[in-house]
């Protein structure tokens, strides 16, 4: 089984290049997903 982790970055409160909060969503994907 190959397991892959995908991450998605969401930034909030950005002024120019400075951001107040960065939230990272990560989830695993597999070739044989039996339950979600």
UniProtKB/Swiss-Prot annotation:
Keyword Disulfide bond tagged: yes
UniProt PTM comment: Contains 2 disulfide bond.
Tissue: Expressed by the venom duct.
Record key words, sorted: Disulfide bond, Neurotoxin, Secreted, Toxin
Propeptide residues according to the Swiss-Prot or TrEMBL record: 1-2
One term under GO cellular component: extracellular region
Entry remark concerning the domains of this protein: The cysteine framework is XIV (C-C-C-C).
Protein's recorded name: Conotoxin Cl14.10
Lineage, uppermost ranks: Eukaryota, Metazoa, Spiralia, Lophotrochozoa, Mollusca
């Amino acid at each position: 089984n190959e397991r892959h982790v995908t991450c998605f970055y969401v930034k909030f409160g950005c002024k120019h290049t400075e951001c107040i909060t960065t939230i990272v969503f990560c989830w695993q994907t597999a070739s044989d997903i039996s339950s979600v």
